[in-house]
C-alpha cells in the first residue's frame, strides 16, 4: 500500500510498551491516572505518554519525516493504586532529546503542559519525576547551597531561626525596619518579607530595602552575629526584579527572596544565576503551590515542584511543618525534604519517593518550616528537620506578650536548649516538654512564651 493509513488511532498501539528497558538518560515520570469509565488503563497511560511527547490525535504524514521510536514518550509500566477504585500509577519514560537543556520551563511545558485537560482522563496527577544526571548537569541549581550558606553566615551545628514580619501589609518602611531590628537583635538569624510584600503604595521597595539594611547592620554590630532579612525582589517584570536584586547587592545584604511559582520558573532561574554571580543567597517562597498540589488525584505533588526548584535554583524553600499533622504526612514531607537536601535519595514508596534520584553534586536547598509554630514545637522540629533547616516563627515571635525582641529571645533559647539536649543524647520526641520546662527557668522571656502558647 502506498502512503499511510489515515484516521484516528489507538494510542496504546504505539505508546504503551511494557517491555521497554528505561535508559539512564530518560526522564521518568510517575502519573496517578484516573481514566473515565470504560477507558482501559493501558490506553489512558499511553495517551498521557503520547500527548506529553510526540503524539497527536490522528495520523499525520509528517510522522514519516522523523523517527518516532527515537523521540516518543513511552508508558512502560502500569500498576493499580491500592485502596482506590479505578486509579493507576502510569510510569512514562521520555527521551532526553525532547527537552531543552537547563530549562525547567520547557520540561514542565512538555510533561504537564497539555495533557491534564484530556477527555479520556477523569483526573491526572504527576506524583514524581526522575531527573537523569545528564539533564541535571545542564542546570546551575541553587546559587550557593547549604554548606556555603553556613560558611557565609558562620553558623554551624543547629537549625537557623527566622521570622516573617507581621502585619504583613500596612506598615511603613521605617516601622517595618524597626520590627526587623528587634527580632534580629533578640537572637534570630533571619527575618522575612511576607510573600505578598512587593512594592505597594504604603511601602515602596527601595525604602523597605534601606531600612531593613540599617536594621541588619545595627543588629550585627550589637550581637556580633551575621544577620539577614529576606528582601522580596519579586516584581511585575523580570527587569524590575533584577533591578531590586542589584540594589540589595549594593546595600551589601546577604540574602534576597523570590516567589518562584507566581514569579515563574524563567524569572526564578535568571534570579538564581544573578545571585550566584553576585554572592547573594536566595530564599524561595512557594506561594500558589496549593493551587497545584492540594488535590490528591489531580495536579502535581509538591515533591515535583521541590525538585524543579532545586534545578531552577534557590537556597531555602518553604516545605510545610509536619508538627501536629498526621503521622503519614510526616514521612511524605521528610521524603521531599531529603530530596531537597541530600545528594542521593533511594526509591522509597512509603515516603512517596517513586524513583531513586542522584543529584550529582548539585548543591542542596534548606527546607523552611513555617506556619503556626511556637516554642513548644521546638523539640519536635529540631528532631524532625535536623540541623539543616530554617525554622520560622512569625506569630510565634511577634505574638510574645512583651514584644518582638523578647519573642526572638524565647525562640533562640528554646532552640539552643533543644540542640544541647539532643547533643547530650536525650530523646527530644519523648522528653521534649520536659526539656522546654527546664530551660524556661533560666529565661524569663522564654517562660512567658511557654505560658502564652501552652497547649
Swiss-Prot record:
Its EC number is 4.1.1.39. The active site is at 166 (proton acceptor), 285 (proton acceptor). The keyword Disulfide bond applies. GO terms for cellular component: chloroplast. It catalyses: 2 (2R)-3-phosphoglycerate + 2 H(+) = D-ribulose 1,5-bisphosphate + CO2 + H2O; D-ribulose 1,5-bisphosphate + O2 = 2-phosphoglycolate + (2R)-3-phosphoglycerate + 2 H(+). The basic functional RuBisCO is composed of a large chain homodimer in a 'head-to-tail' conformation. In form I RuBisCO this homodimer is arranged in a barrel-like tetramer with the small subunits forming a tetrameric 'cap' on each end of the 'barrel'. This is Ribulose bisphosphate carboxylase large chain.
